[in-house]
UniProtKB/Swiss-Prot annotation:
Cell division protein that is part of the divisome complex and is recruited early to the Z-ring. Probably stimulates Z-ring formation, perhaps through the cross-linking of FtsZ protofilaments. Its function overlaps with FtsA. Belongs to the SepF family. The keyword DNA repair does not apply. This is Cell division protein SepF. GO terms for biological process: division septum assembly; FtsZ-dependent cytokinesis. The gene is sepF. It comes from the Bacteria. Homodimer. Interacts with FtsZ. HAMAP family: SepF.
Length: 187
């Protein structure tokens, strides 16, 4: 096993091959045990031609550093167009011309709700004709839609919701009666 490991190390270049180093030594300096071992191994070596490695002459390459030169640095400026803000002829909040009312029967009608709301049109969803599981899915979809487009969702009645875009403000009865909200708050 040690011989196989040694051969693997020699093959990978992790150790030197001692067989060739022994051949170059004078025979008088080797002990008799190694000579006896060579006699047994000699029959294996006779089939192979002997390879002698001659030392290579050392080649020295002289590298000289490049001569230092100084050069002018020219700054490069990128041409930027002059930007003039446009004045809008329309008002910043467009007038509300329509409200969409949708009575979905299946969850597949969520696309029409999303398209209308994305265009900035307030949507009233009447989910009374839907079963509870699909109605819940549609409310979850609408909540995500409202959150993504910075709008608001309000519950009008049981299973009826109002989706209002960010540019639409909804006035409710609570806002009209501020005294009733603060009447019980005596802190």
């Amino acid at each position: 096993m040690a011989g196989a490991l040694r051969n693997a190390m020699v093959y990978l270049g992790l150790a030197e091959d001692d067989r060739y180093a022994e051949d170059t030594e004078p025979e008088t300096t080797r002990p008799r045990v190694e000579a006896a071992r060579e006699v047994r191994v000699e029959s294996r070596h006779e089939a192979r031609p002997e390879v002698r490695h001659e030392p290579r002459p050392e080649v020295s390459v002289e590298r000289r550093p490049a001569p230092a030169t100084t050069a002018q640095v020219t700054p490069i400026r990128k041409q930027v167009a002059h930007v003039v803000p446009q004045t809008s002829t329309t008002s910043s909040s467009p007038e509300l011309h329509r409200i969409t009312t949708i009575h979905p029967r299946t969850y597949n009608e969520a696309k029409t709700i999303g398209e209308s709301f994305r265009e900035g049109v307030p949507v009233i969803m009447n989910l009374t004709d839907m079963d509870d599981s699909d109605a819940k899915r549609l409310v979850d979809f609408s909540a995500g839609l409202v959150f993504g487009l910075h709008g608001a969702i309000e519950r009008v009645t049981n299973k009826v919701f109002l989706l209002s875009p960010a540019n639409v403000e909804v006035a409710s009865q609570e806002e009209e009666r501020p005294t009733e909200r603060t009447f019980f708050n005596q802190s």
